[in-house]
Structure formats: structure tokens, C-alpha cells
């Protein structure tokens, strides 16, 4: 039996809401989080991203430890959806 693989995803609505609250553009978030546009787009599409990306985006958005679970989840890896 093949073991299931897991991945981490971000909640795009939560990211967009926080960006709006902070009056932050995508370019601002990319610059502050020090990530690429492709990486941000993956996060906003709900595709798998690395934990370092989640930390960078949450830090850039000022997400506190107590609310970080509202921004990301661990889920089953789906090769059809998660491949770059």
C-alpha cells in the first residue's frame, strides 16, 4: 500500500483579506516577504508551497502565532493540482 504524501497550502481568502486590511499590493507582499511572483501566485491559487514560504508570507502580513492556522493547512498532496 502506497503511503500518502502531505503538503502545505495557504488560504487565499485570508491572504487577500489581510492584504486589503494593510492596503498592501501583490508587489508589496512580494517585496516584503522576499518571494517570487510565481510563489505568491501558487499560494493564492491554494497550491502546495514550502513552509518557508508560509512563514515569509505570514511574517510580511504581520500574522501572529495565535492566528497563523487561519492562513494555512496541511493536506494530501495531489500531483494533478500541486505540480508546478
PLM segments and residue spans:
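Short alpha-helical DNA-recognition segment
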Residues: 21-41
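A short, Lys/Arg-rich alpha-helix, primarily the initiator
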Residues: 1-28
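Residues in soluble alpha-helical coiled-coils and helical-bundle/repeat scaffolds
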Residues: 20, 24, 44-48, 66
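Short, basic-rich loop-to-helix N-cap that marks the start of a DNA-contacting helix
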Residues: 42, 46-59
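The DNA-recognition helices of helix-turn-helix-type DNA-binding domains
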Residues: 36, 47, 75
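Short C-terminal boundary/hinge segments that cap the last helix of small helical domains
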Residues: 62-83
Amino acid at each position: 500500500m502506497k503511503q500518502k504524501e502531505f503538503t502545505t497550502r495557504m488560504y487565499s481568502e485570508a491572504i487577500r483579506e489581510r492584504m486589503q486590511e494593510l492596503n498592501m499590493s501583490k508587489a508589496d507582499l512580494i517585496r516584503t516577504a522576499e518571494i517570487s511572483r510565481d510563489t505568491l501566485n501558487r499560494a493564492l491559487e491554494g497550491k502546495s508551497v514550502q513552509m518557508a514560504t508560509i512563514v515569509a508570507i505570514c511574517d510580511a502580513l504581520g500574522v501572529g502565532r495565535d492566528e497563523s492556522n487561519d492562513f494555512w493547512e496541511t493536506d494530501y498532496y495531489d500531483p494533478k493540482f500541486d505540480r508546478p
